[in-house]
């Protein structure tokens, strides 16, 4: 029985740490009463081994074993570099 590896796509909002990035994942949630769809954001800390990401990059991350107190995701690839 194999587990499915969780992957997420999001935008880098911080790259100030060494070998770490903060990725914002946006999702649409329906309001329980009014029925309107609302954007909700989740911030995840991810491991960036080569410090190749910059702020604003669109990236794919995957879940891994805990690397620190808050970091349990790692960078898979950069989908789109931010325009400088």
Curated annotation (Swiss-Prot):
GO terms for molecular function: rRNA binding; structural constituent of ribosome. GO terms for cellular component: cytosolic small ribosomal subunit. The keyword Ribonucleoprotein applies. GO terms for biological process: translation. The keyword Ribosomal protein applies. SUPFAM superfamilies: Nucleic acid-binding proteins. Keywords: Ribonucleoprotein, Ribosomal protein, RNA-binding, rRNA-binding. Coiled coil: none annotated. Belongs to the universal ribosomal protein uS17 family. Part of the 30S ribosomal subunit. One of the primary rRNA binding proteins, it binds specifically to the 5'-end of 16S ribosomal RNA. This is Small ribosomal subunit protein uS17. It comes from Aliivibrio salmonicida (strain LFI1238) (Vibrio salmonicida (strain LFI1238)). The gene is rpsQ.
